[in-house]
């Protein structure tokens, strides 16, 4: 529902990071901040507590992060607090990473298989996907024993299901339809 907002915030920060030549630094620092909020019980309570005022949350963030992160990154966090969007920081990072890949003409292909693909299979898959999408492909491989065999590939909203499990599912649907 809020993907559009997440993208707008991420794009605004990306443009600032790009101007400053600090894209990777901002992404890494934001990930560390998400981990800090998640793992520090006291900070997590402050961020999640609805009765702690926005100004109090902003003051706490300034105390923690001033001098430790870039001023413009801190300003971004304070805007998120002001707009009550700080709880969705992880989504902003995800969108910022997507924007970064888009700017570099890259796509991430999430690949699932029962056994790990060998280098030749990986390269063949990368070559075919690069040709299809006209972009540089980054493979993220995951093992999934429930697939029985074959390969499942997801790039954004596109899915290529070449698994035995997927074929069985297609057959089951056809049989149930008749």
Curated annotation (Swiss-Prot):
Any single GO CC term annotated in Swiss-Prot or TrEMBL for this entry: proton-transporting ATP synthase complex
InterPro entries cross-referenced by the UniProt entry: ATP_synth_OSCP/delta_N_sf, ATPase_OSCP/d_CS, ATPase_OSCP/dsu
Pfam families: OSCP
Membrane topology, from the record: Peripheral membrane protein
Domain of life of the native organism: Bacteria
Cellular localisation: Cell membrane
Keyword set includes Lipid biosynthesis: no
GO molecular function: proton-transporting ATP synthase activity, rotational mechanism
NCBIfam families: ATP_synt_delta, PRK05758.2-4
Function: F(1)F(0) ATP synthase produces ATP from ADP in the presence of a proton or sodium gradient. F-type ATPases consist of two structural domains, F(1) containing the extramembraneous catalytic core and F(0) containing the membrane proton channel, linked together by a central stalk and a peripheral stalk. During catalysis, ATP synthesis in the catalytic domain of F(1) is coupled via a rotary mechanism of the central stalk subunits to proton translocation. This protein is part of the stalk that links CF(0) to CF(1). It either transmits conformational changes from CF(0) to CF(1) or is implicated in proton conduction.
Assembly, per entry: F-type ATPases have 2 components, F(1) - the catalytic core - and F(0) - the membrane proton channel. F(1) has five subunits: alpha(3), beta(3), gamma(1), delta(1), epsilon(1). F(0) has three main subunits: a(1), b(2) and c(10-14). The alpha and beta chains form an alternating ring which encloses part of the gamma chain. F(1) is attached to F(0) by a central stalk formed by the gamma and epsilon chains, while a peripheral stalk is formed by the delta and b chains.
This protein's name: ATP synthase subunit delta
Organism this protein belongs to: Clostridium novyi (strain NT)
């Amino acid at each position: 529902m809020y993907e559009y907002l997440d993208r707008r915030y991420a794009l605004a920060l990306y443009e600032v990071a790009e101007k400053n030549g600090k894209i990777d630094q901002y992404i890494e620092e934001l990930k560390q901040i998400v981990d800090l909020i998640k793992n520090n019980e006291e900070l997590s309570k402050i961020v999640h507590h609805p009765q702690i005022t926005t100004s109090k949350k902003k003051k706490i963030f300034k105390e923690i992060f001033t001098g430790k992160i870039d001023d413009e990154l801190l300003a971004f966090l304070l805007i998120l607090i002001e707009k009550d969007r700080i709880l969705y920081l992880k989504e902003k990072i995800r969108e910022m990473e997507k924007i970064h890949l888009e700017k570099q003409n890259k796509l991430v292909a999430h690949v699932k298989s029962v056994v790990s693909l060998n280098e030749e299979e990986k390269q063949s898959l990368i070559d075919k996907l690069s040709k299809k999408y006209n972009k540089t492909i980054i493979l993220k491989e995951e093992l999934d024993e429930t697939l029985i065999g074959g390969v499942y590939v997801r790039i954004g909203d596109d899915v290529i299901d070449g698994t035995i499990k997927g074929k069985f599912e297609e057959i089951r649907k056809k049989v149930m339809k008749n």
